[in-house]
Amino acid sequence: IDTAFFDCFHAYIPGWEIPKMRPEFLTSRYDLITDYLAEYMREMRKRSFSDAIDKFYKLGNNLNQRDVIAVRRTVSGLLKLLHPNGSYSKEDVRVCLTYAMEARRRVKEQLKKLGGLEFFDVNFSYIDNETLEEFFVSVPEQGGSELIPAGMPKPGVVHLVTQAESGMTG
């Protein structure tokens, strides 16, 4: 499995956080015609709210370029849905930023399972421009901080860490 392909995903929403579709979710009243929704979405693609983060926060130093792009685009998309008129508060941006970082962090957690040490050291954070306080974002299914998990492994499990000729551990 190519980890570079999965690293291109901006966000990962776990299915267990979304309720299963049930008949009571459907309506017998008027609802939104998808043509209008599709046209609205097409028009909103022309606008970008990516700079909303910079007004209030700065992204942490541990995010690589793919992470920064993914978080900015996810925040922009969430703000377009929640505040299409462009008027949002610092708290609105914080909520969207935290959610975007959690969604991107989930991508990294899956990559950690596939790619091992390459994606091991992932610390997502953002810094408040006013207070300069740094906030770290984690997810419930986040893996441990140890290379080899504690406890007795299942029979046949082997952990191997070596140093390459380049000096990189992997």
Annotate each predicted stretch with a short phrase:
Residues 1-170:
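C-terminal regulatory/interaction module of P-loop NTP-utilizing enzymes
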